[in-house]
Amino acid sequence: RIDEWQQYPDTVDGKPTKWTPHNANGTFSGAAMPLKSAFAQSINSVAVKLGYELGIHNVAQTAHAMGIESPLHETPSLSLGSSDVNLLELVNGYCTVIDDGKMNPPILITKILDRDGNIIYAAEPEEQQAIPYRSAFFMQRLLRGGLTEPGGTTAALWSYIHPVLKYTDFGGKTGTSNNHSDAWFVGVTPKLVAGGWVGGEYRSIHFRTGALGQGSRTALPIFGNFIQKVLLDDRFAQYRAKFPKKPLEDIDPTTYTCESYYAPQEPDSLTAPTDSLGIALPGDSLQRGNASPEKQPEAKTETTASEGSGNHPQASHTAP
């Protein structure tokens, strides 16, 4: 797909309008790029175009099937994360991807034992295949591309994970609101998914610039420090794992082994309707805002971890 300027019909307060997605640097390269590269670099124009091609309603329905329970506004910017969801929902959606498309609602209490070790309560997982294995496999490759693709917005994670790379694979995705008030990062391994959010109680509380407030600068280190400590601790050796080298189903290798040939070094994308000037500021990804495009020339932190046990993820939620 081509990274280019586009307009999409939208509705604001019941009135028809047009909305244009912007990239983090406020420009469009005009280059055709593989989806793997566009995802890794958080190219907003490509994400919105893909969402339109798939159908915004279909995007919303799939998100709900994967574990998102919050209302989703079916506008073009939904592809960039414009609707509010909580961190636990977000992490659970990523768990669905890592569990090969199987969605398990979060379980707070897995079991209760009496003083003699007898089980008096055991949670019963409610697993369902939310998306096809093929789709989950492709998403796993995209998430890993944030680390391996040139210009990937997850590159900063290397400094945290290099001691454990010999026995664990990683992936992840950043996100930042357009005024730098909210920053996100969700990191994945084959056995553990965790997310971090940095923001204020009110969106008037925000970082001054994207360079300071983007997800790769604020939320990514939360995951990085957490996952490093977990995987270096032999008590949690069960979380060390590698992704399969080949898919479990017959999938044409040419559909997921393409390498990037165009990789501008740019900061992550922004979430926006638009800013006050109608352009995007330096930052990361999310956005707001279905119809055919018209082409023309005080901070708080939260962490959520979900255990991808292969069958039934378990989740914990803390708000330091």
Regions found by a protein language model. Name each.
Residues 1, 46-47, 59, 76, ...:
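Extended, hydrophobic alpha-helical segments in both membrane/secreted and soluble proteins
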Residues 37-41, 86-262, 266-275:
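A penicillin-recognizing enzyme superfamily signal
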Residues 294-320:
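Long, low-complexity, intrinsically disordered segments
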Residues 53, 57-90, 115-121:
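Primarily short, surface-exposed interaction patches in extracytoplasmic proteins
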Residues 280, 284-295, 299:
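Ligand-recognition elements built from short beta-strands and adjacent flexible loops
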Residues 1-59, 103, 115-144:
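Conserved catalytic neighborhood of penicillin-recognizing serine enzymes
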